Amino acid sequence: MRGVSDAHITAFRPVPRTGVIYVTTEAQKLGFRFGAEGWCNLGQGQPETGELPGAPPRVRDVHIDLDAQEYAPVQGLWELRESVASMYNALYRRGMPSQYSAENVSISGGGRVSLLRAAAALGTVNLGHFLPDYTAYEELLDVFRLFSPIPILLEPRRGYAFTAEELEREIVGRGLGALLISNPCNPTGRVVGGDELARWVQVARENDAALLIDEFYSHYIWRDGDDPAPMESAARYVEDVERDPVVLFDGLTKNWRYPGWRITWTVAPRTVIEAVASAGSFLDGGGSKPMQRAACAVVTEDHARRETAAIHQEFGRKRATLLSRLRALGVRFDRDPEGGFYGWGSVAALPPPLNTGMGFFRAALQEKVITVPGEFFDVNPGKRRGGRPSRFRDHVRFSFGPEAAVIDTALERIEALVRWYDR
């Protein structure tokens, strides 16, 4: 007789787990749970959420009025939409004639929900996406069948660089109507910024190709510069907020270090906002009203700058520690991360079985260290590219999102692991 775990309801397909969910599930088989003592989670996709020196105090209480027990509008509370628009104008658009308004903003209950709404609102277009990129894009790009996902390869030997000229060639040559990217890129840490990003926006404008830019790590910028609170957003290079085909996704998850609030936003021309709100009406119904109201207090220019400055100091130190100690073991980085809080390294030079992403993950897991094998970022919607080995089977994503003490302990265990297999 089949057990419950063996049962299969034929109406449902097997849904693959994203990279972080997969590694977390495997760790749970060995006793891991969030907050469990002794575990070091370098696979996590969230930053540490406690107090940081110089940052605004953490929000610890949320007051819920009686009217906040009701549904929020699908497109979000008007006052929060106004706060987001005002913050973007203050951070990126001072002195520019075209300014964002509340009508250019839609609020969602999480980053994946924001992206899901946008994907559901796309028409019958070719949608370009890069390899490697964020693992959750894989199912997102497959579940809706109106658009066709078109992969664009980035080369490790070039540090995953991609020029505006190459972008235009892809748009024109492949007939792309839209492009989905994470910037900074998760997992490589590559940042398209400054004049380069301005040219990308210009190419999109001139070719009427929508740029869908996941900017959830845009306050974690590690390029050299004098700004104590560096941020990067394509909002800075939009000429006309109603005409330029630029759609931005961000929220409190990473840049404010409030992942549990599930407050995110989409910033775009009004016609796009109307479309994603319509999609939200049948996909998710809208986000949490009390949390949106509470978010208004932290979605300000001053709060963003102070939080980013604190992140830059604390996470910058963790980044330097992680990169230097992993590099000393033989982990090779195609490029040092310019943004985000991940190191994307090749373990090919390590002793077997640590010389593949999955082998490294399995061995480190026995030492209660969680990482994410690189093959999960080889986004392959519908598994259409067949059974050939992933180009990133030798890569691992290491997070420096956790507290410094957790990172130090994890690195000590990895160092001991390499010494053991290198005997």
Predicted regions and their residues:
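N-terminal small-domain helix-loop-helix segment of the aminotransferase-like
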Residues: R2-G109, E166, V299-R306, W420-R423
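Conserved glycine-rich beta-strand-loop-beta hairpin in the small C-terminal domain of fold type I
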Residues: C296, H312-L323, F333-A348
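Helix C-cap/helix->beta junction micro-motif
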Residues: F34, R174, E206-N207, L329, ...
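Hydrophobic beta-strand scaffold residues
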Residues: S148-P149, L211, F333, T371
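Conserved core segment of the aminotransferase class I/II
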Residues: M87, D142-V143, R236-Q313, A320-L329, ...
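Conserved core of the PLP fold type I
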Residues: A68-N207, S218-V241, V247, R335
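PLP-dependent enzyme catalytic core of the Aspartate aminotransferase-like
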Residues: S86, A90, R94, R169, ...
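Generic structural signal for small/hydrophobic residues in well-ordered secondary structure
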Residues: V23, L42, V84, V105, ...
